[in-house]
């Protein structure tokens, strides 16, 4: 339960208590229950339609939030996962493979968090090593060779900053992805489904279209990290979250995100199937547009997208 959800849980507990009392004592409390349920519906709508940036950060980080592998089977047909970077090892924090979207063969890559403690240790909490980024690039270059569109799922706090990862060329692997993705001659679409953190997210983010789920975030650093650097106090993360403009709505207004995909009330974890179908429809719409472009136009479209991000004064 998140802090901003506490009032809702208090009402839910009262409803459950009344229902138990009604059943146990054989008394009619239905009128009170109906009133509380109506109140819960109103409060739920009020809470989730007025979320602050820090609230969305908390939702993006939820353990229960759907991961790449939760969405993929609902969106792509006959998905087959492929493994390894053909150099060092297979990185479980980065998944990828091939499947079909409306009969068209596509390549899918994405960061993968764990669903529980054991799985998170196996997946390294979604923080990929260099071999993860090299695996993703191998699959993207394969997609280019066979003229398959690419879909990337961004969901990471950042690339793994450990000593071994740095020794194996973490920064080089991400930089290589940026260079190579910029010149891919097939449609490339990314979606931020949770946290999109730092260069670890950008390593899958040089795409023709950047989509974001309503409660996802995309930033160069976490709010805690930003507040510690700027104000020497990580407790000011709430203020940093507002200042940094990291929410989907903010990034859409800044022309960084191309579309914000609505989530079920309360977050994507409340209805994975509905959320997946919404993502699928959005993928189909953007892919239909990009399929009309030539290879040269796709590269130019991607180039212009990133050239026009941001503002400057002379």
UniProtKB/Swiss-Prot annotation:
GO terms for cellular component: acetyl-CoA carboxylase complex. Pathway: Lipid metabolism; malonyl-CoA biosynthesis; malonyl-CoA from acetyl-CoA: step 1/1. Its EC number is 2.1.3.15. It holds the Pfam family ACCA. It catalyses: N(6)-carboxybiotinyl-L-lysyl-[protein] + acetyl-CoA = N(6)-biotinyl-L-lysyl-[protein] + malonyl-CoA. It is found in: Cytoplasm. InterPro entries: Acetyl_CoA_COase_a_su, ClpP/crotonase-like_dom_sf, COA_CT_C. One of its GO terms (biological process) is fatty acid biosynthetic process. GO terms for molecular function: acetyl-CoA carboxylase activity; ATP binding; carboxyl- or carbamoyltransferase activity. Its main location: cytoplasm. Residues 32-289 form the CoA carboxyltransferase C-terminal domain. Keywords: ATP-binding, Cytoplasm, Fatty acid biosynthesis, Fatty acid metabolism, Lipid biosynthesis, Lipid metabolism, Nucleotide-binding, Transferase. Acetyl-CoA carboxylase is a heterohexamer composed of biotin carboxyl carrier protein (AccB), biotin carboxylase (AccC) and two subunits each of ACCase subunit alpha (AccA) and ACCase subunit beta (AccD). HAMAP family: AcetylCoA_CT_alpha. Component of the acetyl coenzyme A carboxylase (ACC) complex. First, biotin carboxylase catalyzes the carboxylation of biotin on its carrier protein (BCCP) and then the CO(2) group is transferred by the carboxyltransferase to acetyl-CoA to form malonyl-CoA. Belongs to the AccA family. This is Acetyl-coenzyme A carboxylase carboxyl transferase subunit alpha.
């Amino acid at each position: 339960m998140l802090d901003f959800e506490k009032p809702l849980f208090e009402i839910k507990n009262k409803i459950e208590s009344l229902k138990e009392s009604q059943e146990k004592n054989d008394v009619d409390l239905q009128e009170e229950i109906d009133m509380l349920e109506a109140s819960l519906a109103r409060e739920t709508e009020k809470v989730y339609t007025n979320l602050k940036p820090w609230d969305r950060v908390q939702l993006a980080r939820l353990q229960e939030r759907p991961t790449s592998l939760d969405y993929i089977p609902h969106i792509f047909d006959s998905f087959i996962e492929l493994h390894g970077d053909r150099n060092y090892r297979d990185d479980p924090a980065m998944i990828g493979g091939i499947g079909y979207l409306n009969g068209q063969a596509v390549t899918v890559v994405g960061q993968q968090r764990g669903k529980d403690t054991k799985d998170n240790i196996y997946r390294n909490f979604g923080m990929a090593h260099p071999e993860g980024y090299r695996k993703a690039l191998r699959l993207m270059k394969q997609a280019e060779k066979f003229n398959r569109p690419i879909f990337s799922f961004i969901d990471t706090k950042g690339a793994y900053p450990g000593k071994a990862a740095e020794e194996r060329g973490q920064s080089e692997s991400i930089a290589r992805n940026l260079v190579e993705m910029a010149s891919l001659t097939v449609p490339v679409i990314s979606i931020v489904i949770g946290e999109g953190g730092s260069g670890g997210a950008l390593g899958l983010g040089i795409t023709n279209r950047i989509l974001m789920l309503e409660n996802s975030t995309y930033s160069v650093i976490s709010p805690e990290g930003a507040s510690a650097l700027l104000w020497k106090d990580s407790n000011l993360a709430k203020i940093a979250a507002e200042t940094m403009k990291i929410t989907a709505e903010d990034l859409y207004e800044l022309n960084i995100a191309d579309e914000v995909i609505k989530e079920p009330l309360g977050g994507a974890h409340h209805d994975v199937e509905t959320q997946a179908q919404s993502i699928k429809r959005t993928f189909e719409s953007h892919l239909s547009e990009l399929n009309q472009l030539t290879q040269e136009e796709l590269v130019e479209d991607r180039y212009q997208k990133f050239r026009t991000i941001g503002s400057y004064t002379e």
